[in-house]
């Protein structure tokens, strides 16, 4: 035994070959946390003194090779100064460099995901052999940072500038064959053959059959490209990256490129200093704080879903009531994840529409080479369309997805309850109607919950699981388990008008309506909010949702929260609806829609909209700068999010933030409404509320904000 730790062990195998194995005790995955970094430095000390080691393989005892750095430690680490972060990273890099410089060949045996620091660990080895089931990559830019353990330095020298820039800037992991084509690994083998293949490579290095020293030397010197070739590689990468992401919103890819441009002509040690300085700069951006926080919130939401699922009943078969686009989308989602599902409607043409929707979505996967025609047929066979309830006797859960009308829903739910087994869960896919109210029609209200999918079902990851007054924990657990089984991210919320997402969204639309009444141009508001980071502004969003849906939702919200969601004027959204402008669904809303060459609706300006809006605009039009537009819309949005926490509609800031990002597209780089308030500062946010309080209750600071500001608290504890 060369080294024995609770994160890493080094044992001798045969012929002077050592096995350095990552094996974090009591952990599901290996990661570079403080203790692992400490032990890795100790391993290097031991190996520098181990005269009997002629070669070494790097392995993992887990299903994952190394998942990367311990993201939970970033929160505290990134609170340090830029200089302190740089020194921290350089100190870790010292062990990586010394490991690379050991006087014998090293081969990484990549059995599972080698991401971030895990990929960087493999790059300090001379050779890399990979299981054909593994993945490898440098996803750090998705956290608002970039590789800091030598990843930008070694990748450019191993796979070339252009390939390294694409790998780092996109953050997308590579499958084994793609990694082999890039030169990121030297061989791929079946998982069972991995260790033998790694040992064989080491033996070839020891015997001189492979020139491992030359492989190492390439990583220690500048990149071997002339200035023109370098300029072409960087210009191409910048064009690709900046077309995909605004560097003002997501600066990490641009900062990574800048660091690489500085260090490509430097030897390793100097290059790593440049990388460390760039990493520290990225780590101090608000985007890094938000995206690291978002990663941790995502982990918490998934952990909570697992906890909620503990009391779940087994789900062997589901059913959906109501076909069409929504029912077809739900059926597709279940079937594509291996769950048999019955799709019932009272009209055969609706069943055809639902099956057509599922078939269309699966057909696209076949066209993209992600599914075989045989697999498509197998998936479609899991969906059983029917006009009657004959097959419902053994169904474990029924999702009601009929028209958004409380009387229709109550009648359908009451009918199906009498035809299913006593422990069958009933779930309503409603976006606004009270679950407690719908439950009044049922004999077994404890078996009834809300299950709000977002449209389009196959794209939107969020599912709100709504607890009514009488919903049992088993019913909630089973519905959460179903959502997870369908590949969705469930967030459990308590019942109220609009639940969580729509309750927060409608004050945002209300703030938008008020801006238009006072003279703002809807197209300009859209541009401002898109620049802020939304995928679409409020006018375009309501066109996509449908103005009829928007007006119906606004009526429900006005009845539920009249003090702040019932305007005393007719707004632009209601006016356009009355003039039969429904948005994309009938080609005219705030914008006019024309089909592009791909058959997708493209928005264009429409003078008729401006003529109509003149009738609702105040005679004395006001002008608004961009910041005022942002402040007014985001105050209404964020205040209602906080009120949902106050009212215990949602349990944690993490769940609230994740729901708003997944459900309505809140800018991820801003971390969600709660983190947005944190970054603004509670005192500053409170002052902004007071500045606009004269506009109405929606702009007044919730008591929770006042209490937190007085106590010096934040939504996310600072380390």
UniProtKB/Swiss-Prot annotation:
Q: Where is this region: Enoyl-CoA hydratase/isomerase?
A: 1-190
What GO cellular-component annotations does this UniProt entry give? fatty acid beta-oxidation multienzyme complex
Q: Which family does it belong to?
A: In the N-terminal section; belongs to the enoyl-CoA hydratase/isomerase family.
What's its EC? 4.2.1.17, 5.1.2.3, 5.3.3.8, 1.1.1.35
Protein's GO biological process: fatty acid beta-oxidation
Q: Which domain of life is it from?
A: Bacteria
For this entry, the protein name equals Fatty acid oxidation complex subunit alpha
Provide the binding site for substrate: 298, 502
Tell me the SUPFAM superfamilies matching this sequence: 6-phosphogluconate dehydrogenase C-terminal domain-like, ClpP/crotonase, NAD(P)-binding Rossmann-fold domains
- Its annotated pathway? Lipid metabolism; fatty acid beta-oxidation
The entry's active site is 452
Catalytic activity line of the entry: a (3S)-3-hydroxyacyl-CoA + NAD(+) = a 3-oxoacyl-CoA + NADH + H(+); a (3S)-3-hydroxyacyl-CoA = a (2E)-enoyl-CoA + H2O; a 4-saturated-(3S)-3-hydroxyacyl-CoA = a (3E)-enoyl-CoA + H2O; (3S)-3-hydroxybutanoyl-CoA = (3R)-3-hydroxybutanoyl-CoA
Region (3-hydroxyacyl-CoA dehydrogenase) location:
313-719
Write down the position(s) of the site called Important for catalytic activity: 120, 140
Keyword line = Fatty acid metabolism, Isomerase, Lipid degradation, Lipid metabolism, Lyase, Multifunctional enzyme, NAD, Oxidoreductase
Presence of keyword Oxidoreductase: yes
One Pfam entry for this protein is ECH_1
Lineage, highest ranks first: Bacteria, Pseudomonadati, Pseudomonadota, Gammaproteobacteria, Moraxellales
Listed under subunit, the entry gives:
Heterotetramer of two alpha chains (FadB) and two beta chains (FadA).
- Which PROSITE patterns does this chain map to? 3HCDH
Q: Name one GO molecular function term.
A: long-chain-3-hydroxyacyl-CoA dehydrogenase activity
